[in-house]
Amino acid sequence: LETWLRTIDLCNDSQLTQDERGLWGITGGPTEGALKVLAAKAQLPAVEARLVAKIPFDSQYKYMSTLQHIDGEARVLITGAPDVIFAMCREQMSRHGAVPFEAQYWEEEMARFARQGLRMVAAACKPVSLDATTLNHEDLQEGLIFLGIAGMMDPPRPEAIDAIHACQTA
């Protein structure tokens, strides 16, 4: 769980902010912001983390990835659409370490989340050499270990609510 929480925290472009009155805010998108808040509320132990390289999120490939140095170890972290992340993973993390990826189980979980109307974000990681300084899409094609899925309520946008109301009263 800690590795999953650390991944959704560090492979994330949003930031938590606190103003002079002590009020919290989020910069960045609402999905990443929700993940950042979840990680913050978990009160993980502090680590020394340094971003080395990044592949920004793009709707064409549906993920973002970072190469991080975390407490003297190097890891590639990735978050994105579950179906895309599933296709990149051959293993999943368990209490006992990495085990074979159970695709059918996770596809059923994804379907269950979808039936509940949840927006889903999957996370995976892999250890790499501390000498690694670059990150490209090919680096993500093998060795990723699936960590889990976050399911979040995605309330309709105000314009969608207005459109539905207009249709109902037409």
Task: Label every model-predicted segment.
Residues 1-146, 152, 162-166, 170:
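Cytosolic catalytic regions of ATP/NTP-dependent phosphoryl-transfer enzymes
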